[in-house]
């Protein structure tokens, strides 16, 4: 662990949970705000990352979150491979911005869409390997670590994942020296964090990072 949260800079590589209109990479799919589905997350200040940022006087350098995105490159209908996590990691975290923290928050769509989980794999990835979630996650972690050696990589793991996905994400995070955050009891509406859920995510991330610092 290289730096405490207080005053740190950070970037996000995420999915719908981390989107908010006007606050993500231009052209990315947006989920929040969506009052018809989540009626109480209406302002960017209510998102998990903005709460974390405000409470810890942090600076957001990039939020490359894309609603509906999978970690693996076997993307959902209507998406292209460039929407998946490997291509977006290369686009946004190639080493130019050098954040203190990178939050790699994903896997929810892989889990919902029953994508092939596969096994952890720490090198020699082929295009077919990246169509499976755990090899693709390892590829992304490997890229982030190599291009951003100054950064602490944080991997929040959503609730409700298949056990083999949850355990594989823990194993991959440990291999790459990332901090895995095991989220628990997150309040949701239509499968997405409510205002309370966003607060819970921010609190659990901060608490578990603090524990990892000790």
Segments from the language model and where they lie:
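Conserved SGNH/GDSL esterase-like catalytic core that processes O-acyl groups on lipids
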Residues: 28-118, 126
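Residues at the starts of beta-strands that form the adenosine-phosphate
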Residues: 9, 60, 150-152
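Alpha-helical cap/lid subdomain in secreted, periplasmic
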Residues: 81-214
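Short, well-ordered coil/turn elements that cap or connect secondary structure elements
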Residues: 5, 55-56, 148, 175
């Amino acid at each position: 662990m290289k730096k405490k949260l207080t005053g740190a800079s950070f970037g996000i590589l995420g999915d719908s949970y981390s989107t908010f209109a006007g606050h993500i990479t231009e052209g990315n799919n947006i989920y929040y705000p969506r009052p018809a589905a989540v009626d109480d997350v209406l302002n960017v200040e209510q998102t998990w990352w903005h709460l974390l940022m405000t409470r810890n006087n942090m600076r957001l350098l990039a939020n490359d979150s894309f609603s509906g995105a999978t970690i693996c490159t076997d993307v959902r209908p209507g998406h292209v491979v460039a929407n998946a996590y490997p291509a977006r990691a290369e686009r946004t975290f190639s080493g130019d911005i050098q954040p203190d923290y990178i939050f790699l928050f994903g896997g929810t769509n892989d889990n919902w869409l029953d994508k092939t989980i596969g096994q952890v794999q720490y090198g020699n990835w082929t295009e077919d390997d990246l169509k499976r979630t755990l090899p693709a996650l390892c590829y992304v972690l490997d890229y982030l670590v190599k291009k951003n050696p100054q950064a602490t990589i944080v991997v929040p793991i959503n609730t409700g994942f298949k056990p083999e996905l949850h355990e594989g994400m823990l194993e991959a995070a440990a291999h790459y020296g990332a901090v895995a955050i095991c989220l628990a009891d997150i309040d949701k509406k239509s499968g997405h964090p409510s205002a309370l859920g966003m607060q819970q995510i921010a609190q659990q991330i901060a608490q578990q990072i603090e524990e990892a610092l000790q």
